[in-house]
A protein has these predicted regions:
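Active-site helix/loop of acyl-thioester processing domains in fatty-acid/polyketide metabolism
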Residues: 22, 53-76
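A generic structural signal for short beta-strands and their flanking turns/coil linkers
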Residues: 18, 28-32, 43, 78-85, ...
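Short loop/turn motifs at secondary-structure junctions and domain boundaries
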Residues: 13-14, 109
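HotDog/MaoC-like acyl-thioester-processing domains
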Residues: 27-31, 93-97, 104-136
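Short Pro/Gly-enriched beta-strand edge/turn motifs at strand-loop
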Residues: 1-6, 97-101
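Conserved positions in beta-strands of structured domains
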Residues: 20-23, 85, 90, 104-106
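Hydrophobic beta-strand-centered segment that forms part of the acyl-chain substrate-binding groove
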Residues: 65-100, 134
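Catalytic strand-loop segment that frames the active site of acyl-thioester-processing enzymes
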Residues: 14-53
Length: 136
C-alpha cells in the first residue's frame, strides 16, 4: 500500500502520516517503511548539526504500521495509544535512513488491541516496543 492507499484506512494526514508504504504479510504481520528526508518538522531542532528522529516519533511510526493490521476496525475511527511498554532504542535514525517497521497483533479485547513492533535500519535493530491502543 502506498501513502494514498494508507489514507483510505488511517485518519492521519501530513505532517503526521509517518509511513510511506506498508505491505501485509499474512494475517498478522505488517511491514511498513518510512524514509527520513531531513526536512521533517520533528527533525528541526532535534538536534542542530546532529539530526536524529525522536524516539516518540519512531513509536508513532510503529503504531501506524500496526494499525494497518486492523484496517476494517480503523476505517472511520481513530486509533489512540493507551500504552507503550518495554520500549528500547538501539540505534539512532537519521536523515537518509529508511526505517523498516514490523508489527504483529498479540491479543485483542475490543476496543483495545495489543501489539509488538520493531524497527530496523539497514537490518540493524533501532527500536522495539509493545503497544496498546483503543479504536474509538
Amino acid at each position: 500500500m502506498n501513502r494514498e492507499e494508507l489514507k483510505q484506512i488511517l485518519p492521519h494526514r501530513e505532517p503526521m502520516l509517518l509511513i510511506d508504504e506498508v505491505e501485509l504479510k499474512g494475517e498478522n504481520l505488517a511491514v511498513g517503511k518510512y524514509t527520513v528526508k531531513g526536512d521533517e518538522y520533528f527533525i528541526q531542532g532535534h538536534f542542530p548539526g546532529n539530526p536524529i528522529v525522536p524516539g516518540v516519533i519512531q513509536c508513532e511510526m510503529v503504531a501506524q504500521t500496526c494499525s494497518i493490521l486492523l484496517a476494517d476496525q480503523v476505517k472511520g475511527h481513530t486509533p489512540l495509544f493507551t500504552g507503550l511498554e518495554k520500549v528500547r532504542f538501539k540505534k539512532q535514525v537519521k536523515p537518509g535512513d529508511t526505517l523498516v517497521m514490523e508489527c504483529s497483533m498479540t491479543r485483542s479485547r475490543p476496543p483495545f488491541y495489543f501489539a509488538k513492533g520493531r524497527g530496523t535500519v539497514d537490518g540493524k535493530l533501532a527500536v522495539t516496543a509493545e503497544l496498546s491502543f483503543a479504536i474509538v
